[in-house]
């Protein structure tokens, strides 16, 4: 019986270590991507771990605050291009208080103006970190294309 228990514990340890390797690999890939991405024309850094590229400029002069409710389209992908969530594919923009979004989205979208479309590159520390989410492995860099349609104060 003692041997079965030891085998069981060993298997659990091996499985838990492989998950840590994936998490560490994701983190290293995220950091490498962000470092290299800054050399691309049109990519700017808001702060360490948060980059954007302007796809379309609205020019309204109106930006949301954290308390505002925004109406926006989001298309979220991982580094491998797989889509983890898309309001566009769902056929309906997201209407949400800006403060309810992940920190990277909060910071970037608060700088956008109504009518803008930006591509955001968000380090795991400003997203879901080591916790991950269904469809989002731990320590994953998130890429969002965001179109800010309106602000409801």
Predicted regions and their residues:
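Cross-family detector of peptidyl-prolyl cis-trans isomerase
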Residues: 5, 17-153
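Sec-dependent bacterial lipoprotein signal peptides
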Residues: 1-15
